[in-house]
Amino acid sequence: MCKVESPRSGVLLLRRIALERAERLLRLARTVYYEDPDRARRYVELARRIAMKARVKLPKHLKRSFCKRCNTPLIPGVTARVRLRQNRMPHVSVTCLECGYIYRYPYLREVKERRRRHMEGVKDRDAG
């Protein structure tokens, strides 16, 4: 029997290809930035456009690798300043050194996990 290809599988294939191309362009942008920053920005712009056109969500690690305002690849120490902040809500603060935009990524979940593990260790010592 002949297997009929559904239209859905074609869309999934296109989305997978689009994601691979976007990943490759973002990887290239990081390596090319040192020689030609404008080309790196163009690569990021193309990667974003490909992902949006194919309606593909970029994974979190890729989304956080470029500035959404100026399309510069965020390379810690070169194009970005990274700081840990311990305010009310602990977060990582990433500042784009090209345009000055500040990103804040909370890491409260990790703090709560560490605190819970610490409390379990204290209970074990008290019981033992």
UniProtKB/Swiss-Prot annotation:
Keyword Cytoplasm included in the entry's annotation: yes
Top-rank taxon, per record: Archaea
Alphabetical list of Pfam families matching this protein: Rpr2 (PF04032)
InterPro entries, A to Z: RNP4, Rpr2/Snm1/Rpp21
Gene3D superfamilies, alphabetized: 6.20.50.20, Immunoglobulin FC, subunit C
Catalytic activity: Endonucleolytic cleavage of RNA, removing 5'-extranucleotides from tRNA precursor
Primary location recorded for the protein, binned into one broad class: cytoplasm
Molecular function terms from GO: ribonuclease P activity; zinc ion binding
Keyword line: Cytoplasm, Endonuclease, Hydrolase, Metal-binding, Nuclease, tRNA processing, Zinc
GO BP annotation list: tRNA 5'-leader removal
Functional summary from the UniProt entry: Part of ribonuclease P, a protein complex that generates mature tRNA molecules by cleaving their 5'-ends.
Family, similarity comment: Belongs to the eukaryotic/archaeal RNase P protein component 4 family.
Protein name: Ribonuclease P protein component 4
Organism per entry: Methanopyrus kandleri (strain AV19 / DSM 6324 / JCM 9639 / NBRC 100938)
